[in-house]
């Protein structure tokens, strides 16, 4: 196959070990020199959070049969992702009309207004037939889709590679995009060349903030021999845990090892097969071993083969739901007790990602000081990126946030609040798209989650003199 398009930048370095407490002078100017500290209790409760977890459905066809009630029902259930399946059957040999692109844009707006995001799939044949389009036509469609996808990147954290073959799963193509199983006389050389065209078109036209999930491990290994060489192309496994080979997904232990390494830095999600090979690996022991091993980030809530029922009956469903993707836990906070107006103060926050997977979209910690009487606020955003936090962490990482206090700031006591808003303009101010920490309220210590502002009140006080 032709060489892949240049890989995105390498993954952020794993989070460092907790830093030693800074000296009082570091980042502080005009402060009391006296520290106040607090620790936080974790919670094991399921926490609905964007870009992760079980996903619902947005209807049988995202453009032509959008199901607003289903999307709202998924939100009410605690899901924050919906499967957006876009049917392109009518356009196998033609351009996408402007009316279609306008309608697609409107559907994303509906998802946004519902507080949801999507896992997106474009396909020409959502059946075993594989009646797809040529690689050239797929490339053309992706070029047409580019502006709509870019305008709605905030609600497209994940996109399956799609387009090719049966169900958009990159096998059984009737247009020369696969070889072997159910692919006619197409040679593998021809199929590889066509698949590379589609791969490059996906990378070129899908927003850089969107993770792209390919179906076939062998393709990924061929394109990216090292599983750590890029951070954008991951895997969608339509037959996760569905028999010894995941119903033909893997042909060797080496392929499994590669995907486990790949998914440390790129998104891995999927579903179970309705017609899975046997025996299934659907026990709690199975998912609690393989979920973290593959860094499972998101998963179909439909119980195709009794997997979810098995997890529920085994008593682990809540743990699975709470562990998929990231799970951001606050451990502690420290800062000086007072600062002069016009001075600066350093707030040190200890936290960790105890979820099965990384953050895949850029996020940053925000510290807000809120005056107890006037409500005036002073905010600062931490440098860096929460994607650097390694998943399944067993120790804290310290994030130090310097805050400049305006000379004209209101004097008096301020509460300290912590938040992680979305980075996109369209959703940054919407509390439904902010990350909720995996911490329990403790009203006696003044530690409370504020759902309206999507901020955690740390229970500490800072006086501005």
What label would you give each PLM region?
Residues 67-125, 135-138, 210:
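Aromatic-lined substrate-binding rim segments of carbohydrate-active enzymes
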Residues 100-113, 133-160, 191-205:
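An active-site-proximal structural segment forming one wall of the substrate-binding cleft
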Residues 156-167, 199, 203-223:
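Aromatic-lined carbohydrate-recognition surfaces of secreted/lumenal glycan-active proteins
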Residues 5, 322-465:
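Extracellular/luminal regions of secreted and cell-surface proteins that mediate adhesion/ECM remodeling
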Residues 119-128, 145-189:
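Active-site groove signature of glycoside hydrolases
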Residues 216-334:
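Substrate-binding cleft of secreted/luminal carbohydrate-active enzymes
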């Amino acid at each position: 196959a032709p060489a892949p398009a240049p890989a995105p930048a390498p993954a952020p370095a794993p989070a460092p070990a907790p830093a030693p407490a800074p000296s009082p002078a570091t980042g502080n100017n005009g402060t009391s020199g006296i520290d106040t500290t607090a620790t936080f209790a974790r919670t094991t409760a399921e926490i609905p959070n964007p870009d992760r977890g079980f996903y619902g459905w947005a209807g049988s066809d995202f453009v032509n049969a959008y199901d607003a009630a289903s999307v709202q029902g998924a939100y009410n259930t605690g899901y924050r992702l919906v499967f957006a399946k876009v049917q392109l059957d009518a356009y196998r040999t033609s351009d996408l009309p402007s009316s279609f692109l306008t309608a697609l844009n409107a559907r994303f707006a509906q998802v946004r207004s519902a507080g949801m995001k999507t896992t997106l799939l474009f396909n020409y044949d959502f059946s075993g037939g594989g009646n797809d389009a040529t690689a050239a036509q797929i490339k053309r469609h992706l070029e047409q889709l580019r502006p709509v996808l870019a305008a709605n990147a905030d609600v497209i954290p994940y996109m399956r590679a799609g387009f090719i073959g049966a169900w958009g799963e990159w096998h059984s193509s009737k247009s020369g995009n696969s070889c072997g199983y159910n692919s006619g006389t197409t040679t593998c050389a021809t199929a590889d060349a066509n698949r590379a065209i589609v791969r490059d078109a996906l990378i070129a036209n899908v927003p850089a903030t969107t993770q792209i999930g390919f179906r076939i491990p062998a393709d990924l290994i061929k394109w990216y021999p090292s599983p750590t060489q890029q951070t954008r192309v991951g895997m969608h496994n339509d037959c996760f845990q569905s028999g010894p080979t995941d119903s033909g997904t893997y042909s060797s232990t080496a392929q499994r090892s590669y995907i486990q390494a790949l998914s440390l830095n790129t998104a891995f999600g999927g579903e179970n097969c309705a017609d899975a090979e046997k025996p299934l690996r659907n026990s709690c022991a199975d998912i609690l071993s393989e979920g973290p091993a593959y860094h499972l980030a998101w998963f179909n809530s439909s119980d195709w083969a009794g997997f979810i029922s098995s997890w529920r009956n085994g008593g682990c469903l809540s743990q699975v739901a709470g562990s998929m993707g990231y799970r951001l836990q606050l451990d502690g906070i420290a800062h000086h007790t007072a600062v002069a107006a016009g001075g600066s103060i350093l707030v040190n926050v200890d936290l960790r990602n105890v979820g099965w997977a990384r953050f895949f979209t850029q996020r940053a910690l925000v510290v807000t000081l809120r005056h107890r009487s006037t409500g005036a606020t002073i905010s600062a955003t931490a440098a860096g990126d929460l994607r650097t936090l390694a998943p399944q962490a067993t120790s804290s990482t310290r994030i130090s946030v310097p805050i400049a206090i305006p000379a004209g700031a209101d004097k008096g006591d301020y509460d300290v609040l912590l938040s992680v808003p979305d980075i996109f303009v369209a959703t940054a101010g919407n509390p439904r798209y902010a990350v909720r920490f995996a911490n329990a309220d403790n009203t006696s210590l003044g530690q409370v989650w504020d759902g309206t502002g999507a901020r955690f009140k740390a229970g500490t006080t800072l006086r501005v003199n």
